From Swiss-Prot:
Origin superkingdom: Eukaryota
Family the UniProt entry places it in: Belongs to the paired homeobox family.
Official protein name in the record: Paired box protein Pax-6
Pfam families in UniProt: Homeodomain (PF00046), PAX (PF00292)
Length: 437
């Protein structure tokens, strides 16, 4: 063990000395010495392979030889792949392995078998002797060659399509000019470039297309090419629309079985039916939103404010009294005159629900509707129409009276806009009065 440590120390010292002599040298994280841009010596490479054959793991080899783990893995991977421990080209970039001959062979293999993999192409290049282990391209390099071939083929196809369109439109110069794309019109002041005869009819000039077979064939080819570039919108017949609307009334979200059944029935692709239902749901949401807006507008226009007075056709108007509270006796419901019917006028709504005891009511504060309450024995009343039972007279006499007395009905304070009917029996009224107090 001391001898090994001494060996490691000597190696580190020699590495430091070498680093002092060469400015581009360094020490890795394990204490091993390396030179930037230069591969490991062949002796170290051979030791890495020997330790790997003896069963040592790459991490153990890295610690024993003080070589980085990435370097050990790269050397072992290249050894298992090619059987060689020699480094790649030293100095500069490696020579180009994808030569034109190799690229031509790769393209040939791809044409013969379009689904071939890059590693299969690599094996064929080795088996047929086109490349050796030293100049064989890697799998990533072969994939890059295949991508370049595919892009070149696509570009050639696009150029050929554009050339065909130029030929069909009678163009020899620029692409997409006005005379070629718009044969039905001509620029004023210029001769007709299509060689068509101008005909005068109905006050307009048109360029007639020659009626020979070649022109009609070119027109058909032009239409076919344009159809390939863009799909036309699907047009539905009346029967198809009726079937789709009927299914939409049943459900807005048909499942795949319903769509397939509908597709077989009306002879449409299932994808088109799915798109139709999506558009129809969007239309239904817009219509539902408009219906809700109209419904809200109608409700707001027919609403009656709370502060408005009631109609006189429902509630009979009573002449305006000169006193704060008007009392009339009579038989309004067919009762005898002995039955006392009290009519009262309510005050306009006030912000608070309070009982005003001693405030006089002004005649201008009365409103225009009246109501009948059940009969009660004549007792002295107070202002603001509060009911006083007989056994409460002692308490009531201690307070000031503002109105002269006939019967007054039990009414809650002016803040309530709807009249409240108070029971006429004395025990109930006593309980009611105690609650109000």
């Amino acid at each position: 063990m001391p001898q090994k440590e001494y060996h490691n120390q000597a190696t580190w010292e020699s590495g430091v000395a070498s680093m002092m002599q060469n400015s581009h040298s360094g020490v890795n994280q394990l204490g091993g010495v390396f030179v930037n841009g230069r591969p490991l010596p062949d002796s170290t490479r051979q030791k890495i392979v020997e330790l790997a054959h003896s069963g040592a793991r790459p991490c153990d080899i890295s610690r024993i030889l003080q070589v980085s783990n990435g370097c050990v893995s790269k050397i072992l991977g290249r050894y298992y792949e090619t059987g060689s421990i020699r480094p790649r080209a030293i100095g500069g970039s490696k020579p180009r392995v994808a030569t034109p001959e190799v690229v031509a062979k790769i393209a040939q293999y791809k044409r013969e078998c379009p689904s071939i993999f890059a590693w299969e192409i690599r094996d064929r290049l080795l088996s047929e002797g086109i490349c050796t282990n030293d100049n064989i391209p890697s799998v990533s390099s072969i994939n890059r060659v295949l991508r370049n071939l595919a892009s070149e083929k696509q570009q050639m196809g696009a150029d050929g399509m554009y050339d065909k369109l130029r030929m069909l439109n009678g163009q020899t110069g620029t692409w997409g000019t006005r005379p070629g794309w718009y044969p039905g019109t001509s620029v004023p002041g210029q001769p007709n470039q299509d060689g068509c005869q101008q005909q005068d009819g109905a006050g307009e000039n048109t360029n007639s297309i020659s009626s020979n077979g070649e022109d009609s064939e070119e027109t058909q080819m032009r239409l076919q090419l344009k159809r390939k570039l863009q799909r036309n919108r699907t047009s539905f017949t009346q029967e198809q629309i009726e079937a789709l609307e009927k299914e939409f009334e049943r459900t807005h979200y048909p499942d795949v079985f319903a769509r397939e059944r509908l597709a077989a029935k009306i002879d449409l692709p299932e994808a088109r039916i799915q798109v139709w239902f999506s558009n129809r749901r969007a239309k239904w949401r817009r219509e539902e939103k408009l219906r809700n807006q109209r419904r809200q507008a109608n409700n707001s226009s027919s609403h009656i404010p709370i502060s408005s007075s009631f109609s006189t056709s429902v509630y009979q108007a009573i002449p305006q009294p000169t006193t704060p509270v008007s009392f009339t006796s009579g038989s309004m419901l067919g009762r005898p005159d002995s039955a006392l019917t009290n009519t009262y006028s309510a005050l306009p709504p006030m912000p608070s629900f309070t009982m005003a005891n001693n405030l006089p009511m002004q005649p201008s504060q009365t409103s225009s509707y009246s109501c009948m309450l059940p009969t009660s024995p004549p007792v002295n009343g107070r202002s603001y129409e509060t009911y006083t039972p007989p056994h409460m007279q002692a308490h009531m006499n201690s307070q000031s009276m503002t109105t002269s007395g006939t019967t007054s009905t039990g009414l809650i304070s002016p803040g309530v806009s709807v009249p409240v009917q108070v029971p006429g029996s004395e025990p109930d009224m006593s309980q009611y009065w105690s609650r109000l107090q």
